[in-house]
């Protein structure tokens, strides 16, 4: 991979432990740049970067900058952060994460995956198909790819596959060759203000691709289908509907995942063919749909049908996307990042496909603003759960919003007809509640983008202790999710 044309000195990342920031930092480090950073706490990403030799300070202080020549920040970093203040006082450039990602993308041809849900899994699927076909792509993803143990990799090929984060609008700056849009729901309205502004951002994202590129768009989603009509670029559509250029049919599922045929139709020539019996070792129709995006990209890059089948058959998914953390007394525990009502609904339907018993959902709502703006949707997205346990809202730095609380959601679910809902007094009480509720064959699905992932990973051992089981069962990662 080419480097940037000028020497830029040490690159300092504020919030380097974030999933998006850590991936860019890792690729820059592997390109030979001097990279350092800081974060408010240790985490998996910080530990991984340190093993690579990247210096990471815990806590934000002006002195952390050292000899930094450029500072990279995400939208989560406030303007009064002491490192940002010090950088600006010293006339050190402060750039956003998306701007640095865009500069990396200029060095290769790139596939950028956007959408309010499914980006991370779809990005990893595109990367898996390109990797299986020998493209050796550079990858920057929004989640840990199980096969790599990281969310980023510097490849030797000419292509890069990236997740395009729409949360702060900066994805419109990414110079993609191929754009993917999985779906488009009202989200991040604290930034956009209105859904119309969000639509306009997705329009610009697609319009940014060059005339020789194309956009893969999911026409199962009405907002994305409307985008097809507005786009002035080459379009390849995908989905379950009969009008899609890449369509899944004959979908079946069991404990091994999903099996389906893929019909591929050429709009111009009228030619059609079928990729038969694709096996995706993941649960849920939403993941079949995500795979169609990757197939649409792959076939338009000349990847053979048999290679597509082979790559998907060994696909191992993404961390925190329907990840099995363990089992206790016949009860399986799942950890999933889903925190939007659409994602939660899809994950619970996948749990129905994967399990033989009841589904018990444990949800930690993420952000007061999201719970408030989508309250009605949250009250109706748990119908596939036999029981729901609601934890306190994970604030993510926000102040409480009236009517957006654990108690309000419990009452809202009951008012909307759910038969079995209860509040979680504290994380420490979870194992006891699950022990009383769950029976062998049941599945406990922990949902949320906050600290609930730690609860999900501890829960099997805590249940073992309550059942008097010594040793327990070893966790076995199984992918699914969004």
Curated annotation (Swiss-Prot):
Keywords: ATP-binding, Cell cycle, Cell division, Cell shape, Cell wall biogenesis/degradation, Cytoplasm, Ligase, Nucleotide-binding, Peptidoglycan synthesis. Its EC number is 6.3.2.8. It comes from the Bacteria. InterPro entries: Mur-like_cat_sf, Mur_ligase_C, Mur_ligase_C_dom_sf, Mur_ligase_cen, Mur_ligase_N, MurCDEF_pg_biosynth, UDP-N-AcMur_Ala_ligase_MurC. GO terms for biological process: cell division; cell wall organization; peptidoglycan biosynthetic process; regulation of cell shape. It catalyses: UDP-N-acetyl-alpha-D-muramate + L-alanine + ATP = UDP-N-acetyl-alpha-D-muramoyl-L-alanine + ADP + phosphate + H(+). The keyword Ribonucleoprotein does not apply. One of its GO terms (molecular function) is ATP binding. GO terms for cellular component: cytoplasm. The keyword Calcium does not apply. It is found in: Cytoplasm. Signal peptide: none annotated. SUPFAM superfamilies: MurCD N-terminal domain, MurD-like peptide ligases, catalytic domain, MurD-like peptide ligases, peptide-binding domain. ATP binds at residues 115-121. Pathway: Cell wall biogenesis; peptidoglycan biosynthesis. Transmembrane segments: none annotated. Its main location: cytoplasm. HAMAP family: MurC (MF_00046). Belongs to the MurCDEF family. Cell wall formation. This is UDP-N-acetylmuramate--L-alanine ligase. It comes from Rhodospirillum centenum (strain ATCC 51521 / SW). The gene is murC.
């Amino acid at each position: 991979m080419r480097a940037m044309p000028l020497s830029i000195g040490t690159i300092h990342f504020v919030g380097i432990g974030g999933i998006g920031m850590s991936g860019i930092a890792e690729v820059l480090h592997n390109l030979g740049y001097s990279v350092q950073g800081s974060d408010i706490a240790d985490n998996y990403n910080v530990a991984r970067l340190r093993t690579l030799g990247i210096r990471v300070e815990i806590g934000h202080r002006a002195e952390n900058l050292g000899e930094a020549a450029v500072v990279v920040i995400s939208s989560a970093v406030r303007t009064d952060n002491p490192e940002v203040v010090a950088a600006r006082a010293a006339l050190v450039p402060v750039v956003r994460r998306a701007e640095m990602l865009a500069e990396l993308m200029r060095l290769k041809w790139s596939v950028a995956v956007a959408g309010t849900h499914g980006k991370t899994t779809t990005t990893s699927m595109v990367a898996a198909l390109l990797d299986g076909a020998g493209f050796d792509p550079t990858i920057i993803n929004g989640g840990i790819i199980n096969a790599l143990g990281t969310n980023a990799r510097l490849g030797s090929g000419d292509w890069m596959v990236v997740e395009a984060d729409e949360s702060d609008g900066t994805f419109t700056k990414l110079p993609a060759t191929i754009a993917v849009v999985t779906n488009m729901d009202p989200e991040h309205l604290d930034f956009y203000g209105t859904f119309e502004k969000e639509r306009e951002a997705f329009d610009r994202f697609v319009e940014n691709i060059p005339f020789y590129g194309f956009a893969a768009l999911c026409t199962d989603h009405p907002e994305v289908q409307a985008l097809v009509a507005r786009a002035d670029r080459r379009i390849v559509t995908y989905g379950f509907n009969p009008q899609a250029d890449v369509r899944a049919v004959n979908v079946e599922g069991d404990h091994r995942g999903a099996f389906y045929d893929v019909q591929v139709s050429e709009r111009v020539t009228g030619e059609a063919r079928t990729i038969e019996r694709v096996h995706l070792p993941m649960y849920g129709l939403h993941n079949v749909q995500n795979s169609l995006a990757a197939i649409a990209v792959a076939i338009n890059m000349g990847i053979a049908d048999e290679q597509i089948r082979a790559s998907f058959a060994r696909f191992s998914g993404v961390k925190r996307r329907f990840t099995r953390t363990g089992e206790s007394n016949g009860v399986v525990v799942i950890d999933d990042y889903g925190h939007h009502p659409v994602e939660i609904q899809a994950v619970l339907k996948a749990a129905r496909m994967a399990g033989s018993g009841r589904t018990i959902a444990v949800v930690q709502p993420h952000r007061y603003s999201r719970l408030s703006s989508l309250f009605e949707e949250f009250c109706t997205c748990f119908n596939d759960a036999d029981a729901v346990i609601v934890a306190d809202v994970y604030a993510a730095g926000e102040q409480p919003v009236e009517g957006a609380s654990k108690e309000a959601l419990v009452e809202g679910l009951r008012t909307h007809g759910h038969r079995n809902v209860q509040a979680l007094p504290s994380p420490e009480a979870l194992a006891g509640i699950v022990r009383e509720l769950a029976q062998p064959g049941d599945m406990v699905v922990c949902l949320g983008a906050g600290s609930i992932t730690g609860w999900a990973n501890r829960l099997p051992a805590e249940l073992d202790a309550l059942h008097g089981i010594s040793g327990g069962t070893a966790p076995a990662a199984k992918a699914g999710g969004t």
